């Protein structure tokens, strides 16, 4: 298992600096480059690629990113998938050309023979991506309706599992911190499956309390602000259990609870999503839903390989099961 010492050594900084960066300490005076290096080092050390024979690059594949580099550092989930795509593409003999959506100009994307699109896109953006090259594989969005292969992760099932876990330990007052995602064009707002599943299951269990549901952005700062709102607004009725839509939001939420001297998990249990590297280094370590990001990235490349070999192959969606990992942030 990767330790803070390992990360500090690889990134060339102190152990204390690593700890504060992994906990998104906003009072730490470091350069953006140092913060980026530490976060990326943590994810790279946590990622363990399968050993494969590497071959000389023969095919150029575009990897389309929908988030900026800074946005990726605020939600490390996509960075995990990116590393898996890069490793599998290299072993398959693909030259990977990494681009953001705004960079899709003809002069920068010549000779592309396939596309992997990481993130969420509206119909206009899908058309732009498909015009670049065929075939296209989308990762983290079901695109069967657009005749494209897709790789996704099951988040609805774990929401139900978490709620039932809370009930089993006597917690029926359950809060939720979630986020909203919008296409880069701003034309479409995507419904988050975690939020929808939370609403559905809580209503089915007759546990839904709209006042316990807070929606912001998938960032540490938003998690911090949303939990502060919950603490201020709800006071003594603050829920004993919180589901937080991703780990980096949960880091901010833990900071707000700590500042308010609210003990975790004795007073509030917190369970989040994605199991990125920082989840192991929070205080206390986060209970979280592990997304199969390694397998998602590898499968995206393998689906692309299959479609390049057989363009008439019927598109398919591969939806990976997620696993609840219990740590010290929850009862």
UniProtKB/Swiss-Prot annotation:
Q: What is this protein called?
A: HTH-type transcriptional regulator GalR
Q: What does this protein do?
A: Repressor of the galactose operon. Binds galactose as an inducer.
Pfam families, alphabetically? LacI (PF00356), Peripla_BP_3 (PF13377)
Q: Which Gene3D superfamilies match?
A: 3.40.50.2300, lambda repressor-like DNA-binding domains
Question: Which residues, as ranges, make up the DNA-binding region of this protein?
Answer: 4-23
Q: Which UniProt keywords apply?
A: Carbohydrate metabolism, DNA-binding, Galactose metabolism, Repressor, Transcription, Transcription regulation
The keyword Transmembrane is annotated on this UniProt entry = no
InterPro entries of this UniProt entry?
A: HTH_LacI, LacI/GalR-like_sensor, Lambda_DNA-bd_dom_sf, Peripla_BP_I
Organism classification? Bacteria, Bacillati, Bacillota, Bacilli, Lactobacillales
Q: Which organism is it from?
A: Lacticaseibacillus casei (Lactobacillus casei)
Q: Which SMART domains match?
A: HTH_LACI
The record's Gene Ontology biological-process terms are:
galactose metabolic process
